[in-house]
Regions:
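Conserved non-transmembrane functional hotspots
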Residues: 1-134
Length: 134
């Protein structure tokens, strides 16, 4: 039917810009939760251990909640990688604080900044692949 194909064409034209925006926002989210970026954004001289830990965790969660609706526009596999990237960051940050109870805050900041986020990298690759298949 001609009407069905026209409807699909119009839907495609409406959805594609939203999908592209979702891809952009989720790549930006992954970039913003990279360890060195988080440390640079949150750390300042004189910050307490508790405030530093809380601020990093809160930043990751706030960024995630801000981008939650993007789930509508990406595949389930991409969304799962986004979730795993977020969890990887939260777990690593908590582990540094728990494993180094007597370390000074500068050492903790340096240690956190040196981490990599392989799940984040996988998520970005997945997003790029989805984008390229539009």
């Amino acid at each position: 039917m001609k009407g069905d194909s026209e409807l699909k064409s119009v839907s495609y034209k409406l959805i594609v810009p939203l999908k592209i925006q979702a891809y952009e926002r989720l790549v930006l989210y992954i970039e913003r939760i990279q360890f060195p970026v988080l440390v640079k954004r949150v750390f300042h001289p004189g910050i307490s251990r508790n405030d530093f830990q809380f601020s990093i965790l809160q930043n990751v969660q706030d960024e995630f909640e801000h981008n939650l609706a993007q789930r509508l526009y990406v595949s389930e596999s991409t969304w799962q990688l986004i979730l795993m990237a977020k969890e990887e960051v939260l777990q690593n940050v908590n582990a540094v604080f728990n494993d180094n109870p007597d370390a000074d805050i500068a050492m903790i900041a340096q240690k956190i900044a040196s981490f990599e986020n392989p799940m984040g990298e996988k998520a970005v690759v997945n997003i790029k692949n989805e984008f390229n298949s539009l």
